[in-house]
Regions:
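Membrane-interface transmembrane helices that cradle and orient dolichyl/undecaprenyl
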Residues: 8-9, 102, 144-160, 194, ...
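Short acidic/glycine- and proline-prone juxtamembrane loop motifs at membrane-interface regions
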Residues: 123, 129-137
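Membrane-interface alpha helices of multi-pass inner-membrane proteins
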Residues: 52, 114-115, 147, 159-174, ...
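Transmembrane-lumen/periplasm boundary regions of multi-pass, lipid-linked membrane glycan transferases
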Residues: 169, 178-279, 297, 347-352
Length: 516
């Protein structure tokens, strides 16, 4: 596959792009159809959000929730059904990497190397193996980068308007797309792309992006800028332990250390190669995003992940040209092989492809300790995997407590969950086990509120009896939920039955609001 190129082959290479894209799709469907550890904590919450569609949510813009609502109707909410669209997003990102490489001047070798890197990069394959905003960030960044390459090649008004729409969708998916916009703005000032400022089209693109994004702005303004509060609390709380060193190390580890040999030459190509310089807008976008995240001091390394697709494409071109000058195609083949092999070694840490006990042994053999980006105590699994365990058992235990209530109490009973994972999981399994309505003061659940009347018995998760007696006349420990591989704070979780509320739920809502 990695062979010397000939101009006549350029139009016959679509299979080199479609092949890896199909492999990406097939891998995710197989991994989730025949394996996996279960539905991830956040996915339960996202399902709940998708059933309460709005122009915004406390912890995310609305685009991915609308996609999930459509996905639920098409594919259901099983493990594999939830993850079809992220799998498609990965496949399309691979496809766009190949197309970008071709537009940058690459041929078969460049396309192959770019597609392989995006196919196997641990952070990309991990993000797209579950339903989350990050899965679509990779696709949207890649699509916006491709449109910029087309604009640099031949500017057309329609391309600018399409770019504006894509940028608006990027912001509606996740606010980190602001960094892409900041890099583009810098490029319009610092490069020969400034010639476009003499036309109306960059401004039309910005206006289009703002128009597409405006529903979330309006939602925030009408909800006390809840998303800003969420970002502030998360940065000061659960992400406060992250350091700049963590961020820098993650750029190597999460993308696969071998892949540095692909994306670093790609960055060089965009800034210093005679043919690559006209596309240096892509390099500037990466650098601006990198600087913003590094300056923040508490950024998760994965935040920069979507920016590497365009660097992998450029790196493929750089390697192809270097190899062609000295008939060094063997070196490119060796790099591709090393990249794939190393990614396969890292893969079990990104996607649950091994039985859990096998993974624990594999991790120990490599000397890798469980990790988290948040200030939390860990189990024998990294947080990403641990948060896939224990949810059905929790629903069973709460259901048993609910069924133990006298028949006359059940119609007015509710469950008070302390975080969105617990609340979302209980709602998810309500179709399988008898469960009452669920309320919570965490993130968007706070806005979704509580029954305004008719609340009697409250089943409360967490806390201690002494504190609960301040709010309830009668408190009884009804059960303790245990789970083997879950996060420690979800293990040995007390489940209380509280009767005779001493305070109104209105007061509880004002005191217990938690946006983080």
């Amino acid at each position: 596959m990695l062979e010397a190129d000939h101009p006549s082959t350029k139009n016959n290479d679509i299979g080199l792009i479609l092949g890896p894209a199909f492999i990406a799709l097939a891998f995710h469907l197989a991994a989730n159809g025949f394996g996996g550890y279960g539905i991830f904590r956040d996915e339960f919450y996202y399902i709940a959000c998708s059933k309460r569609l709005a122009a915004g949510f406390v912890d995310q813009p609305p685009l991915s929730m609308f996609l999930l609502a459509a996905s639920r109707n098409l594919f259901g909410v099983s493990q594999i059904g939830l993850r079809v669209l992220p799998a498609v997003a990965h496949a399309l990102a691979v496809l766009l990497a190949g197309l970008i490489a071709r537009k940058l001047g690459g041929r078969r070798t460049a396309v192959t190397l770019a597609c392989l890197a995006v196919l196997t990069a641990p952070i990309i394959i991990g993000h797209t193996n579950i339903f989350q905003m990050n899965a679509f960030s990779h696709l949207i960044w890649a699509l916006a980068a491709y449109l910029l390459v087309l604009i640099a090649e031949r500017s057309r008004p329609a391309l600018w308007l399409l770019l504006g729409a894509v940028m608006g969708l990027g912001l509606l998916n996740k606010l980190d797309f602001l960094w892409f916009g900041a890099g583009l703005a810098a490029s319009l000032l610092l490069t020969d792309m400034r010639k476009h400022l003499a036309t109306q089209w960059p401004y039309a693109a910005a206006a289009t992006a703002l128009l597409v994004f405006s529903p979330f702005i309006i939602w925030n303004a009408s909800h006390g800028f809840a998303h800003i509060e969420f970002i502030r609390n998360a940065t000061a709380g659960k992400y406060s332990g992250l350091t700049r060193l963590d961020f820098l190390a993650g750029q190597a580890l999460l993308l696969n250390p071998v892949n540095m040999a692909i994306w670093l030459p790609g960055l060089y190509f965009l800034f210093f190669d005679r043919d690559g310089r006209r596309f240096r807008v892509l390099g500037i976008i990466y650098v601006i995003a990198f600087v913003i995240l590094l300056a923040n001091g508490h950024s998760k390394a994965e935040y920069l992940g979507p920016a590497y697709i365009m660097l992998f494409a450029a790196g493929g071109v750089a390697w192809e040209r270097w190899a062609a000058r000295g008939r060094r195609i063997w070196a490119v083949a060796g790099l591709a092989g090393a990249s794939v092999l190393t990614s396969l070694l890292i893969l079990p840490f990104a996607v649950p492809v091994l039985p859990v006990e096998t993974f624990i042994k594999y991790s120990a053999a490599l000397g890798v300790k469980p990790a988290t980006a948040e200030n939390l105590r860990l189990s024998v699994l990294p947080q990403f995997f641990a948060d896939m365990f224990g949810w059905e058992g929790l629903a069973q235990d709460v259901s048993a407590v609910y069924r133990s209530l006298p028949a006359e109490e059940r119609p007015t009973a509710v469950v008070f969950a302390r975080n969105y994972g617990e609340a979302g999981a209980l709602e998810y399994y309500a179709g399988k086990f008898p469960l009452p309505g669920v309320i919570s003061t965490h993130n968007s659940y706070w806005f979704w509120g509580y029954p305004k009347k008719g609340v009697g018995t409250v089943i409360v998760l967490r806390g201690n009896a002494e504190d609960h007696r301040k709010s309830c006349a009668e408190v009884a420990l009804a059960a303790v939920h245990s789970c083997r591989y879950c996060m420690p704070y979800e293990n040995d979780l007390p489940i209380y039955v509280c009767r005779g509320l001493r305070v109104s739920l209105h007061d509880v809502w004002n005191e217990e609001r938690s946006f983080d």
